[in-house]
Amino acid sequence: MQQNFAQKQMSKVFDGKTKIVFLGLDFTQAKFIGEEGFKDPYKLKTYYLSNWNALLEEEYAKYNLPLNSLKARHYETNTSDLMVLNDAIEDIEDAIINGSHYIDEKDVQKAVRKYKLSDNKGIGVSFVVESFNSSLEKAVVWVTFVSMSNGSLLYTERMEGKAEGFGLRNFWA
């Protein structure tokens, strides 16, 4: 039954009529790999987590987001709900590691269950961050579709991308 609901909701993503809400980057499952690339945990939490979301919200057309191809007439961005979760991350120092880090669909589901969405119409899209790896210059995120009406996970897929840009903020955007 849940799968039928998810399939029906996901078909709406491509109909051009359903409101699509970009929810932002969810860092609750993330690790920042390569201590040399992330030297200031305080600034990472208090500046970069919110600024990466703000950058994607304000300049989404500039970035190659998968959402740009959905042709939604009712496209919005609202990163404030996820920023509450990102702001609540404790011990950001523990998120900076040398090594590897992987999450799976169960971890994404765990993250989505914590979403308290202020809007209840349409389909939300979040990027659940698995890792920003400064050694490999690679970002790994789970592109995640969520029902705004009940917060259920509709679909998620792991994606990797090369980090590039000038300065730490733009490098990871």
Language-model segments: residues:
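Short secondary-structure boundary motifs at beta->alpha junctions and helix caps
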Residues: 149-173
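Solvent-exposed loop/turn segments at secondary-structure junctions
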Residues: 27-30, 130-135, 161-164
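Surface-exposed short loop/turn segments
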Residues: 85-149
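Short, low-complexity, polar/charged sequence segments that are solvent-exposed and flexible
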Residues: 39-45, 144-148, 162-163
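Generic structural hydrophobic/aromatic packing signal, biased to beta-strands
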Residues: 20-23, 143-145, 151-157
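A structural "domain/chain start" motif
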Residues: 2-95
